[in-house]
C-alpha cells in the first residue's frame, strides 16, 4: 500500500462514520500539502547545492531583473513581500559572498542601495541555467495540457484564498 492509498483509507474511514464527510475535499487538501512539501524539499536541495536557499535566490533574481541591477532594501522587501529583517539577513549573506554591494543612495544619503556585483550576475546566470534543467525534470511526468491545467487550478485556488 502506497502513501496515497493509506491516506485515502484514513479519509474513507472518516467518511464511513459520516456519509456527508467531504472526502474529496479532504483528499485534495492532503494531496496539495504532500505535493507542496515534496516540491519545497526538492527545491531546498537544489538551491542548497549552490549554498543558498529560495529566499536568497529571489533577492538575486529581483536584482538581476532591474535595469541597473540595483534596488533599495525597502524596495526589495516590498516587491518580494519579505520582512525588512529577512532582507537584512539575506543581503548580509550575499555581501559576504561577494554577490552584492551596498552603496549610498544618490537621492537620499540616509538610505543604501543594493547592487549586484559582476560575480553576483555570473552566479545568477549559472544558477538559472542549472535551474532550467532542474525545473524541466521536476515537471517532466506531466503533459503540457496537465501543466496548463495545474497552473489554471492553482491560480484559481490562490485567488479564492485571497478572497476568504
Swiss-Prot record:
Keyword Membrane attributed: no
Superkingdom of origin organism: Bacteria
Subcellular location: Cytoplasm
InterPro entries attached to this UniProt entry: ArsR-like_HTH (IPR011991), HTH_MarR-typ (IPR000835), Tscrpt_reg_MarR-type_CS (IPR023187), WH-like_DNA-bd_sf (IPR036388), WH_DNA-bd_sf (IPR036390)
A GO term from the CC aspect: cytoplasm
Alphabetical UniProt keywords: Cytoplasm, DNA-binding, Transcription, Transcription regulation
Span of domain HTH marR-type: 25-159
PROSITE patterns, per database record: HTH_MARR_1, HTH_MARR_2
Gene3D superfamilies: Winged helix-like DNA-binding domain superfamily/Winged helix DNA-binding domain
Chief location: cytoplasm
Molecular function as annotated in GO: DNA binding; DNA-binding transcription factor activity
Coiled-coil segments on the chain, per record: none
PANTHER family in UniProt: TRANSCRIPTIONAL REGULATOR, MARR (PTHR42756), TRANSCRIPTIONAL REPRESSOR OF EMRAB OPERON (PTHR42756:SF1)
Listed name of the protein: HTH-type transcriptional regulator PapX
Protein's organism: Escherichia coli
Amino acid at each position: 500500500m502506497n502513501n496515497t492509498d493509506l491516506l485515502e483509507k484514513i479519509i474513507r474511514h472518516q467518511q464511513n462514520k459520516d456519509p456527508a464527510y467531504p472526502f474529496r475535499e479532504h483528499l485534495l487538501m492532503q494531496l496539495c500539502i504532500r505535493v507542496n512539501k515534496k516540491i519545497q524539499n526538492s527545491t531546498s536541495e537544489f538551491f542548497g547545492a549552490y549554498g543558498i536557499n529560495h529566499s536568497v535566490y529571489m533577492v538575486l533574481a529581483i536584482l538581476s531583473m532591474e535595469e541597473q541591477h540595483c534596488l533599495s532594501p525597502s524596495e526589495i522587501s516590498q516587491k518580494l513581500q519579505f520582512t525588512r529583517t529577512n532582507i537584512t539577513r539575506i543581503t548580509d549573506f550575499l555581501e559576504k559572498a561577494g554577490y552584492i554591494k551596498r552603496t549610498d543612495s544618490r537621492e537620499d544619503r540616509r538610505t543604501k542601495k543594493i547592487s549586484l556585483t559582476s560575480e553576483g550576475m555570473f552566479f545568477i546566470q549559472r544558477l538559472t541555467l542549472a535551474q532550467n534543467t532542474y525545473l524541466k525534470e521536476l515537471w517532466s511526468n506531466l503533459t503540457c495540457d496537465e501543466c496548463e491545467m495545474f497552473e489554471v487550478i492553482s491560480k484559481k485556488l490562490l485567488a479564492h484564498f485571497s478572497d476568504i
